[in-house]
């Protein structure tokens, strides 16, 4: 239609050159690409980004006539500019830790709307500047929000949201009074041989009010970390690492666990390679009833069933584990030390978790340590944790102990648009913020999960629940 008009206008102009009677003036909008010369013009949108604020600048040809409103729980900033036009088709791309999107729209020929979708209800200031004319939007990058509520007497829950120059962070925090709630370590399926289990089902099977994932584990469900449950060893590691001990006086203690296991038979000492884990080449593995009813081993080893300090059976594979006994499973060179052992021989099994935690009835092996006596104390290097745990931001699960003995269970989402995750140091700082004086790290990544009253509170980074090897649960006393 515009082309037809231009063609007709050209003809009129040509005729106008022949006769003044037919002369015509070119409209303002044709001379300015569709914008009236009487209108204010938005010619450019540009950004300025610092550690403390994001600045959005609209370059104008005249002073702005504008209005501002907030929508979507104050996370959306809407700026309407009146008696203005623009040739801009869209706002320039913006990579920001605080803004999701910027949308530029027009209404009719004289209204322009700019929508700024923020990740949180950030503080924003909108103002004008002259010489040259500009409309400026300053968005402060620091925002923090806590949404606390009491679940029941002795149990409080807080959803924590923070946005700053690092990005958006979302965490879920439970604070439990141990005089009203029991904290327990429970296995997936109640045995290691059962394999892994999703946390929601694990919590339900124990009638738990709340639960978080526990320590590290292998794909078969065996635990990676020095772990004891109700006096029996559940899993071990070669590394000396921070563990949580349930002490005889009822207190919780964070300290270094050091597993040492030895079998004494016929005057010889044979050191254990591990407990309740797959038997490898030349290994000596101890199985107890925490593992399950049977060892599940293959026929390439020899197994000695022990009850009340004596060998009661010698098998080749998949031995039955007595309720009050153990099975010593050996392979390769380890078999040489047991070559002369026969049924009825006395055998001694010694286990120790180190001077600080050996008296604990239950030990949760994980790490590293994060807080000690109210101060940041991250021991990832000393405890020889690999880079996927020690470095970078990730989803995290952590436990803290307050000065009054209350416990903090914390899950932090990561690797998602609503939450960047935390480093170990940032995890320690967040525990500290919620009042913990001592704290340590549990398994994280896709395992990080919190269940409260049968509902998953966080957003696991796998997109759904990852089956885990163990969980820490809260039950009412």
Where are these regions (language model features)?
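Gly/Ser/Thr/Pro-rich low-complexity, intrinsically disordered segments
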Residues: 6-7, 17, 22-65, 72-79, ...
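Repetitive helical segments and hydrophobic/amphipathic motifs
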Residues: 11-12
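Positively charged n-region of N-terminal signal peptides that target proteins for export
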Residues: 1-4
């Amino acid at each position: 239609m515009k082309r037809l008009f231009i063609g007709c206008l050209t003809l009129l102009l040509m005729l106008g050159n022949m006769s003044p009677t037919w002369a015509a003036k070119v409209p303002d909008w044709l001379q300015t690409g569709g914008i009236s010369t009487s209108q204010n013009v938005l010619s450019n949108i540009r950004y300025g980004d610092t550690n403390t604020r994001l600045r959005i600048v609209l370059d104008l040809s005249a002073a702005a006539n504008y209005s501002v409103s907030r929508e979507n729980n104050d996370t959306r900033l809407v700026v309407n500019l009146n008696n203005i036009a623009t040739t801009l088709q869209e706002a320039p791309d913006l990579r920001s830790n605080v803004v999701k999107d910027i949308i530029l729209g027009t209404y009719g020929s004289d209204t322009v709307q700019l929508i700024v979708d923020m990740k949180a209800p950030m503080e924003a200031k909108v103002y004008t500047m002259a010489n040259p004319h500009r409309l400026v939007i300053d968005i402060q990058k620091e925002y923090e929000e806590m949404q606390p509520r009491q679940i029941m007497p002795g149990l409080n829950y807080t959803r924590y949201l923070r946005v700053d120059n690092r990005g958006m962070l979302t965490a879920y925090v439970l604070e439990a009074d141990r005089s009203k709630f029991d904290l327990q370590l429970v296995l997936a399926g109640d045995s290691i041989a059962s394999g892994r289990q999703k946390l929601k089902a694990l919590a339900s099977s124990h009638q738990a009010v709340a639960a978080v994932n526990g320590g590290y584990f292998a794909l078969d469900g065996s635990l990676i970390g020095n772990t004891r449950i109700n006096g029996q060893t559940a899993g071990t590691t070669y590394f000396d690492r921070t563990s949580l001990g349930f002490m005889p006086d009822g207190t919780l203690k964070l300290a270094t666990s050091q597993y040492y296991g030895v079998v004494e038979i016929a005057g010889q000492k044979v050191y254990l390679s591990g407990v309740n884990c797959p038997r490898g080449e030349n290994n000596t593995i101890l199985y107890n009833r925490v593992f399950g009813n049977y060892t599940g081993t293959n026929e390439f080893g020899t197994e000695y069933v022990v009850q009340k300090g004596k060998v009661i059976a010698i098998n080749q594979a998949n031995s039955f584990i007595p309720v009050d006994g153990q099975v010593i499973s050996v392979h390769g060179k380890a078999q040489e030390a047991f070559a002369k052992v026969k049924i009825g021989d006395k055998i001694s099994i010694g286990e120790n978790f180190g001077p600080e935690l050996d008296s604990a009835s239950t030990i949760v092996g994980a790490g590293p340590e994060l807080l000690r006596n109210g101060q940041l104390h991250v021991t990832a290097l000393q405890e020889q944790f690999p880079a996927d745990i020690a470095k970078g931001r990730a989803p995290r699960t952590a436990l803290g102990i307050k000065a009054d003995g209350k416990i903090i269970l914390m899950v932090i989402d990561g690797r998602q648009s609503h939450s960047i995750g935390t480093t170990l140091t940032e995890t320690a700082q967040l525990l500290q913020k919620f009042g913990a004086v001592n704290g340590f790290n549990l398994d994280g990544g896709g395992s990080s999960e919190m269940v409260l009253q049968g509902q998953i509170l966080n957003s696991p980074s796998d997109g759904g629940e990852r089956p885990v090897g163990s969980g820490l649960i809260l039950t009412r006393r």
